[in-house]
């Protein structure tokens, strides 16, 4: 399971190129563009790396990198806030984290907010008025069951309407679900076919999530964290597990840094000639303690 420590962004030695509206992910017959985040062993975002620091493979075959850039581009972002009963003791910290995210947003960013408990609820469509988002959740309480999969499914579809090519879904939740109509399989399929990166933040203290028995809470926590981690890994996002309010706020700031310090790697697929419905992408980065986060693959047109 990918558990990332909280830290600040590492300074760039290389100069960034001017901001450009690059696609978050694109795969066609000519070029595949893959967004990549790099973190060090402390969890700090690393920028300023050169093209030759990266190795990319598709279905195990090394690919020649044809284009390479590092851009700070605007983001169309969806936020899903879990307001179910299992988040009751973490709700105050979750609201603080949401505020930290909003305050870290760039002027060109846009975001919508969906909440979830027994059913998904749309709190705000795409807006640049982030104060409106904060106002809508200021007096909300946590209660009820959790239709998390439904909320994520609906939010991924809503993200398609975002004006910016770069798209991300931020999920503040413990990962538990007990009231959804969609299945986890349906959500995974939609996630890998979308062009959005999913970033998740989950409280790591079982006692803060469930008052009805520590053993059951630990078991459900483990399943929820695995579910969130898989969604993040498949889409090139990062899953954060936090244990107190301070770490939660830092996680949101780290996600903001990740969104604004991405590399985009482009390549023309060269494989062994097999016709594959699913093509696996693997990105590695040179450097002690560095790790690259990229989506797990794509389905060719």
What are these regions (language model features)?
Residues 1-2:
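Sec-dependent N-terminal signal peptides
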Residues 5-301:
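Scaffold/interface architecture of coatomer-like assemblies
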